[in-house]
Swiss-Prot record:
Annotated binding of Mg(2+) 3, by residue: D530
GO BP annotation list: alpha-pinene metabolic process; diterpenoid biosynthetic process; green leaf volatile biosynthetic process; terpenoid biosynthetic process
A Pfam family: Terpene_synth
Protein known as: (-)-beta-pinene synthase 1, chloroplastic
Family: Belongs to the terpene synthase family. Tpsd subfamily.
Amino acid sequence: MDLISVLPSTSKSCVCLHKPLSSSTHKLKPFCRTIRILGMPRPRKSVLMASSMSMSVNTLVSDDDIQRRTGGYHSNLWNDDVIQFLSTPYGELAYRERGERLIDEVREIFSSMSLEDGEFSDLIQRLWMVDNVERLGIDRHFKNEIKSALDYVYSYWSEKGIGCGTKSIITNLNSTALGFRTLRLHGYPVSADVLKHFRNQIGQFVSCPSETEEDIRSIVNLYRASLIAFPGEKVMEEAERFSEKYLKETLQKIPDCSLSREIGDVLEHGWHTNLPRLEARNYIDVFGQDTKNMESNRKTEKLLELAKLEFNIFQSIQKTELESLLRWWNDSGSPQITFTRHRHVEYYTLASCIAFEPQHSGFRLGFAKACHIITVLDDMYDLFGTVDELKLFTAAIKRWDPSATDCLPQYMKGIYMMVYNTVNEMSAEAQKAQGRDTLNYARQAWEVYLDSYMQEAKWIATGYLPTFEEYLENGKVSSGHRVSALQPMLTMDIPFPPHILKEVDFPSNLNDLACAILRLRGDTRCYQEDRARGEETSCISCYMKDNPGATEEDALNHLNVMISGVIKGLNWELLKPDSGVPISSKKINFDITRAFHYGYKYRDGYSVSSVETKSLVMRTLLEPVPL
């Protein structure tokens, strides 16, 4: 008999589903809590202890006499009062007008480079300007100037790199590493072999004995460049190992200063978890304290003032968007869904950290809503719902009709309508942006997503432990990356005609790798807590099944090697030359991957959002930059 049939069972026993999604693996606070569901639950608590930390899984009996599990998650950190009464003066016209004047003045700085820069520094000064406007988060205003500067640098690029200027006799590491990184990120075809010319006679990177600030900055830029590696680039791996070791040792020797803070930020966040708005916030502090800046004070002051002003002006936009998000959250009935995590503000913050252009409001709100829905569904399929209820819900989604709620349990009716209404609303927004109806395309993505949940429910119901390959293929879908990205992405002012969309969304390599890294990183961060909760299936357990005698350490080492390879593959899919797909079309899906990756940098930051994730909200959303 098929345990995942559509017809409901008459049994009232609860099958506790295991679904080791990266977004469903929970690192929990050490407490138990009874959660009221359906009016009058009769609590039965059980606590599972993990070796690394205390865990809690709450068991209760609801009004229908079904024993259910809840995760014991900490509550929503951001109530309506905190958000609704945020005030910022930076939405006023005077600040916007000052910003426009500063933009013009920075454009003049770009223009003056061709007149003022000597031929012994013209290349490095152009790279300095491009690098700094990007790190400060103000590059969207200077697209033409950036292209002109990089075209100029690339015209002097050689297989041995570049020097500081067009008349420089020899190349140097700082100019070449910074130039390589910047040119590659903008799609110029530059080879990593250029770095081989900075190794010694036995093929090793070596540091300069003098270790001046300029020498150290050269290694900082070498490290930053090494993170933009493509598959098979051994010299990039060597550069990363050397520069990371060097910079960690340097931090132990130099005093606290702007350079040490820059090194600390670069080492901590690297490239794949260095979200653009977070980088801007951190770099504003570093840039403003760098008294030995190689450029004149005039350039530094203008860039810094514009970066601070832009950062704060955007917070006034965020306040308006947060008010809209909270209305949706309340109107959708989300506060009444008490068994789930409420992380809508955190998801909005992640969206704001990767797409902070004012016109991308639809993306930011859509991403927050989609991720909230995914979290509710995740907790429902993973913990709270019975197999029979979940079969009904999955079938109802495929009907896509409000009347389908007639066959659902009461607690599922509101969840169904939240999915139905929000997906329809996002499709309407996408139609405005793309000029075509994408609802059926979006529905198909959600259906496949829920089918992957049900596959995992079938595995747990039958006690089946899949092979690693079988688990990963299904887990890439159940990770939720595709449904979190698809509709928000289509609301942007970036054209996604069908031939472009298939290179960004399913079945593209970019989408496959993005889903893979979310599954792999999620499992490596959360498998111990899942296992302590009685959920055995993960990348780690499946690998150990396929490789008898392998230890957990063996499995983790294998997965970390896989993750490193996936990251390089993502770099290639984003930046490969002559792909026929603009980098701008691929970048948002790539950046969504970076956002999710950030959430798993230290822990499961979606279940335990009260540490690093809370700090991200405070630093990028709630706290203005002092002018």
